[in-house]
Amino acid sequence: MAGRLPACVVDCGTGYTKLGYAGNTEPQFIIPSCIAIKESAKVVDQAQRRVLKGVDDLDFFIGDEAIEKPTYATKWPIRHGIVEDWDLMERFMEQVIFKYLRAEPEDHYFLLTEPPLNTPENREYTAEIMFESFNVPGLYIAVQAVLALAASWTSRQVGERTLTGTVIDSGDGVTHVIPVAEGYVIGSCIKHIPIAGRDITYFIQQLLREREVGIPPEQSLETAKAVKERFSYVCPDLVKEFNKYDTDGTKWIKQYTGINAISKKEFTIDVGYERFLGPEIFFHPEFANPDFTQPISEVVDEVIQNCPIDVRRPLYKNIVLSGGSTMFRDFGRRLQRDLKRTVDARLKLSEELSGGRLKPKPIDVQVITHHMQRYAVWFGGSMLASTPEFYQVCHTKKDYEEIGPSICRHNPVFGVMS
């Protein structure tokens, strides 16, 4: 370990990419996962096209810079957690490494993350990019859910370090409920929910559009996003919450002030019901999506009930939140309450059906919140990549040259025993 440079940890999500060095408590950069490229439709001869292609390959921006370039085409290479455009992803990684991390890839091991149910072929593509294009000495591709479980060890609620638990990973583009037993994902039981951060933003945008006329149309989405991040919370009871706002509006209704990008004048809007109705679509999805009506607590319950019977209790006991969309105030508390109701009702029913002969042992339902939730996956990666074990399980350049990209199809679990 001595004298070795720290590993680079890169967590690419649908909306944001988190990057930094292992051993740190938070990522050095959090940038939008987008890339701005020049799309030219000029008709030129062969020789000129060759010159232009070389120049165009270098003429691109990523992250916040990409969003600010109106003359470029902005692309998002990752959709619903899975990489869709590998050429763009390679260029994206190029700037991540050289411009942001300012690292020499030959000197650092890399830990990259992957969504649940990622295909082995995708792991091979990742390995090819990292070993062929960037010549890295070692690569480990970690499952996001396992890293999120490791990150939850920082919580005071966690007594012992375990890699068994249910991870609710809700980012910008997708929400997954992933059961993990001893560090291995139970793939057949994963469920995904078509509601995530972006859907909440769209829903708030729609609510604001119906009521507030002063928002410039081209800024309505970013206004909705700011309202969501600044003011939203999860309420325990919808009807009571509506009554609160109706009886004592001045206490609950907030003001948001934005600046019109074109006229540079200020505009102010009132933020009322949107504060709690936004995140409420996790618990009442039919508000935003008529095709999907299953609340998140029922999805979690169904996932755990589909798992092998001997891991169900530990899965209920260790429900870990991860990702930016779980950051709403009281999200964990509401989820725990709803889930406990479902579980207790089932136990009560089984007792009644047995005519009182069965006395089921109560099930301990615990939803774990911790201060690393937003970057849980990155932070879990940072913790695990700073252990000596990490370097033993990494796939090295030597292995890659001997065997080929197929070595990255399987990445052994580690960090459980320590």
UniProtKB/Swiss-Prot annotation:
Tissue: Detected in fibroblasts.
Matching PROSITE patterns: ACTINS_ACT_LIKE
Gene Ontology molecular functions: actin binding; ATP binding
Main location class: cytoplasm
Keyword terms of this UniProt record: Acetylation, Actin-binding, ATP-binding, Cell projection, Cytoplasm, Cytoskeleton, Nucleotide-binding, Nucleus
Sites bearing N-acetylalanine, chain numbering: 2
One BP annotation, GO: Arp2/3 complex-mediated actin nucleation
Pfam family, one: Actin
Annotated Gene Ontology cellular component terms: Arp2/3 protein complex; cell projection; cytoplasm; nucleus; site of double-strand break
Entry keyword ATP-binding: yes
Keyword Cytoplasm: yes
Subcellular location: Cytoplasm, Cytoskeleton; Cell projection; Nucleus
General function of this protein: ATP-binding component of the Arp2/3 complex, a multiprotein complex that mediates actin polymerization upon stimulation by nucleation-promoting factor (NPF). The Arp2/3 complex mediates the formation of branched actin networks in the cytoplasm, providing the force for cell motility. Seems to contact the pointed end of the daughter actin filament. In addition to its role in the cytoplasmic cytoskeleton, the Arp2/3 complex also promotes actin polymerization in the nucleus, thereby regulating gene transcription and repair of damaged DNA.
Family that this chain belongs to: Belongs to the actin family. ARP3 subfamily.
Subunit structure: Component of the Arp2/3 complex composed of ACTR2/ARP2, ACTR3/ARP3, ARPC1B/p41-ARC, ARPC2/p34-ARC, ARPC3/p21-ARC, ARPC4/p20-ARC and ARPC5/p16-ARC.
Protein name as catalogued: Actin-related protein 3
